[in-house]
Each structure stands twice: as structure tokens, then as C-alpha cells.
Amino acid sequence: MKEGKARLTVLGTGTSQGVPIIGCKCDVCRSKDSRDKRFRASAYIEYGGLNILVDAGPDFRMQMLAADLCHLDAILLTHNHKDHTGGLDDVRSLNYIDKRASEIYCEQNVLEDLIREYPYVFKFPKYPGAPEWHIHVIDDKPFMIRKDSSDKELVWIHDVGYHYRLPNGTLIPTARCLDDMIENADHTGGNDGVEVIPIRGYHDKLPVLGFRFGDIAYLTDMSSIPDEEFIKLKGLKHLTLNTVGYKTHHSHFSLDETLVLADKIGAEHTWLTHLSHTFPVHEQFCRNLERMCAERHVRSMVQPAYDGLVIE
């Protein structure tokens, strides 16, 4: 499959609390500008004919409705925090529409947390109506995503739940043990899918992943990136990078740290995400960034992302 150019739609640019924050009366939280309304961080990527989601937090349902999306070929998880995984139950609608299990790509430690946090998904025999997930375990090595990576058709049986329909018409339960739901990601390459390049970072001490799709990279919830990872970020047109606030933070990049990284990586455009209400309203923030980048000679155009932004 020819990968071609990637197109990224920003579905959410907020912190774990979103913006506005419950009970806050600051200028940003009371702003009428839609660009100051921020769902939890997430992105939708169209790449090589595939529809790919990065992270499915508590706002997943509203984000899918806002962007008028009804099909996903893959869901990539950056890490195991609830603001990035808390909406995964809502893939049930996609299971029903597509008649396919949702293809979820995550690291082993994330999978272990999903098993604890969504026990009904992994319980056997399966509870009728539980989401259908097919897990691909990834690490920091490039991996392949293929369209309809599972060719098994889901059939809903009322009061019983989903079954797979075999080519001969026989119906079998979707999963009878964990091994039926989990496999290692495909690192073999080939021409019948798209290659995704993971970027290792750390969220304080927690290992997390960002992802590169062609000339677009999406990084969130990082406070450090190992030196050996920067080679994966060369030649970018667009970089999306988390920036939680002005002050140094133990698990997120501050604005000063982000501007240093934007200059070091040198993407044509750097978009800031995972933004808190401590930054000013959108228009003022844009002016502030323009001035700061000019003063520091940052070799990238740095702007705040906003929900609904499309970059390509």
C-alpha cells in the first residue's frame, strides 16, 4: 500500500482535566473562542488509506461525533493514563457498524493496565455487549498497520453477544482466552500496509510512545526524549508536542523546554498540545509565541494547536 501524505486532525488539545476546568472562572475557562475549548488530547490520522486514532480518552465519544467519524482501522495508545484510555469502552458502536473487532496497538505495560481497568472485556466467557478488542503489542520499533488486519466478521446474537462467522458460515465465540485477543505487532514491513515509527519518551519516569506518520509526528505527555530518538524526528513538516504550562513540570514539557525542542528538531511547523488554562486566550497566546520565537531565533513556526485543527 502506498503510504503517501499524512493528514492529521487534532481532536483534543487539553490536559487531563480539559479546558474549561470544572469550577474555574479564569479568562481562558470563560472564553467564548472555540479555540479555547479543549477536549482531552487525541488525534486522528489519515495515512495510506487508513484511518488511525491516537488515544481514546474520556472525550472519545464527543470527539468522534464532532469530527463526524464512524470508522477506525487502528487505535494507537501512547500510554496507560485515563485521559488517554478512558473512552475505549465506546468502541462498541464501531464494532457494531464495522462488524470487526477494534484493532488496538499498545505496549505490554499498557495492556496489563487495560486488563485491570476493563476486566469485563477480558473475562471469559465474554459478557454480551462488551467491546471487542484485538490487541497488537508494540514497542519502540517501527510496526505495520494493515487494513482489515482481522478478516473475521463479527455477528451479533441477541442476549448472547458477538461471534465470529467462519468462511463456511459456522459461528464461534469471539474469544475463549487471552491468547485469542492478543498478538505481537507486525515488524516485517511489506507493501500491503503502512509503517508507523514510534518515538520513545518519558512521562516523568513512565515510558510512553509518540508516533511518526510520514512527515508528521505526534508527541504528547512527555517530559524527556532520549538522545537516540531524535534521528527519528529528522525532516518533519509538522511536529505536535505537549506543552503543559510556563512552569517546569515533572511529567510534561514546559513552554521554555518546548521552544528548545522545536528549534532542535527543526520541523517546518510545531504545534503545541496538551495545553492548560494557565496560558492566555488563543489570540494572545499566538502573539506571545511569535514574539518569543523571534527573540530566540527558533527555527520552526510554533503555534498553539486547537481542537479541529487539520494539518497536512
Feature annotation, model-predicted:
Residues 60, 225-226:
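Short, surface-exposed beta-strand-loop junctions and turns on beta-sheet-rich folds
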Residues 149, 165, 226-312:
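Binuclear metal-ion centers of metallo-dependent hydrolases, dominated by the metallo-beta-lactamase
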Residues 1-219, 284-312:
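Binuclear metal-dependent hydrolase catalytic cores
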